[in-house]
Amino acid sequence: MRSRLLPCLLLTLGSTAAGTAQEYSVATLADSLRQNAQAVVRLYETDFQYNSPSSATARHDIVVTLLDRRGARHADLVCYVDMFSSLKSFSAEICDASGRVIRKLGKGDLNYTEYSQHLADDAAYYWLEPPLSVFPCTVRYRYETAHKNGMFGTLRFVPLSTDIGVALEKARFRLSTPAGYAFNCRCTPFPVEPVRHTDRGRDNYEWTFPSR
């Protein structure tokens, strides 16, 4: 299990959840990913639909299995928002070792913190430290963000942190744009080429990152 090499996808733009809880039971986890791991990111998936510089949505599906109490921090969630983005929906499930759901959480369970009341960009973030009572266990997050009023800078997709003790099973990034829309992207530390197809006037790209 190696976690120092950080898979990262950067996309520069102009100004469906899959799987069931049972699929993420601890018994289905490969031994190679368990080795020296406190936690395993079972799935880290983002579907980003870009419509225009003032309209886009992103759907996120994150599944993390915590092998022992030391890995609990790897299930913490942070979602940043500002004047250009907002959190539309959120749900979470906590499952036992067999994948059985033992607790469900909603948007009302999130904490909300503003960086400063004096900032003009409305920068803030939602965060959650899930209430965990049994180990091993699995936490699944599904949430959607809306992007509006112009898009600036770079989209970052970072499915694996640099922390020692966490492994990655599967990661996918999907991007849908109007047909012919041009953008720049870069994958580090190793190149990953997307699968591309055009359907109903939109170009669709999918990057799949191998387990690490």
Show which residues each predicted segment covers:
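Bacterial N-terminal signal peptides that target proteins for export
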Residues: 1-7
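Bacterial N-terminal signal peptides
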Residues: 7-16
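Beta-strand-rich, non-transmembrane domain signature
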Residues: 21-212
